[in-house]
Amino acid sequence: MSHHSETILTAILNTKYLENGSKHKIIELPKTNIKKLIKDFLSVNSNKKIQSDCVLINYFPNALLLDNPNKNSSVKKEQTNQVKIIEKPITNNINKPEDIWDIIDNMDKENNSESLENIQSENSENNDNFTDNNTKKSPTKSRICSGCGSKGTLLEDQSSSVLVCSECGMINDDLLDHGPEWRQYYNDDGRGEGVNRCGCPSNFFFPKSSQGTILAGTGSGRLKRKQKWNSTVYKERSLNDVFEKISTICSKSNIPRIIADTAKILYKKLSDCKHKSGNNVGKQIIIRGHNRISIIAACIYKACEMNKNPRTVKEIARFFGIDEKKVTKGNKQFEKIMKNTDDNMIILDPVNSNSTEDYIRRHCPRLKVNKDHTDIAVKISNNCCRMKLASDHNPQSIAAGAILVMVVFCELNIDKRKISRLFGISDVTIDKIYKKIAPYAPALVDDGATDHLINKLKING
């Protein structure tokens, strides 16, 4: 190290110690005046039109730590007096400057070492837990050999399906394979029949046909189907025909699948009902002929009500291509059989099974009415039922009248004929309900106003 660089380094270190109030010992300055050297250097480079700060930074990287020459003279005298207080110089690391990058590298190394130690400790803990869990789960680790009495020496021989001791070679127990017999890749091997050796699971709709194991033949597919149907119970064969008819009608009429499944369950439970009185006590109720079609239509009608997606009798009759009277007759017969069934066999919710809200929420999207206006129509219909303004009409007619009141109240451009055609109700019926509801429309829109009218008029008591 040259004399000039050593002088600059010593001055910078002393100034830093004094500013930070460090307890390090002050290093003795060389006899050469550092400030005079810097002034000489700046005077030499001033002709080159270079800024003094840039020159200092380029040639003396730590020169900014020195005192500013513009400071008060009193502060300079105090600092020079402090520098003159000399103790014994520190012999260690005088010639080595403190590099900030070395400090950062050392800190990174310490952090990396700490993280590695943490990872190693976590891995060791996980390994210990894994071994503990294995010893708890595996029964062979804790079992004792019946031949030599050693513990933890039993091994599972999968090829022979036995539990063998690794010390004495004695067979202690047999093993059972709880996995599948073999895997089936959905007949990708080209074989027509399946390779499973067990039958299908029990079916709620066909309990008798799902029992036992069906052995498939090697003939053509048509013979297999005949063999399958010949082995099926007659009653379940007729049930399958009914279920196919329900599925076909629901799919053609855009009825959701959940309604079709509910209708199948209702028909299945009705077919299992038995007579409770008369000459046929204990015998199952037989449903056949035209009576069966009416019962199927009634099951779909009830399933729509149970799933809050009601259909009118006229719609159900149109789906099946039968008269409305047959649908009504089927509903009456359905209720009659339901009364004669065992307790809790068929559970129907008589309350709110067919409400005005269900009809409104079903038909408003077809009228291109948004959700806010739909909620207003629902509120009008509910408050109308609470005030008993149109109690002599069915829910479908009240829903149509509530939609018409909402259209007039909100000033929407929807024709009354379109509502009557969509609901299947005459214009006269809608006009009757409208005249009953329209005078109370401002109150029916607000639940608080409706409550006030109910209390004032004492409608509910």
Curated annotation (Swiss-Prot):
Residues 113-142 are annotated as: Disordered. Gene3D superfamilies: 1.10.472.170, Cyclin-like. It comes from the Viruses. One of its GO terms (biological process) is transcription preinitiation complex assembly. Sequence repeats lie at residues 246-327, 360-430. It holds the Pfam family Zn_Ribbon_TF. Zn(2+) binds at C145, C165, C168. GO terms for cellular component: transcription preinitiation complex. Residues 121-137 have a biased composition (Low complexity). Keywords: Metal-binding, Repeat, Transcription, Transcription regulation, Zinc, Zinc-finger. GO terms for molecular function: TBP-class protein binding; zinc ion binding. A zinc finger (TFIIB-type) spans 141-173. Belongs to the TFIIB family. This is Putative transcription initiation factor IIB-like protein. It comes from Acanthamoeba polyphaga mimivirus (APMV).
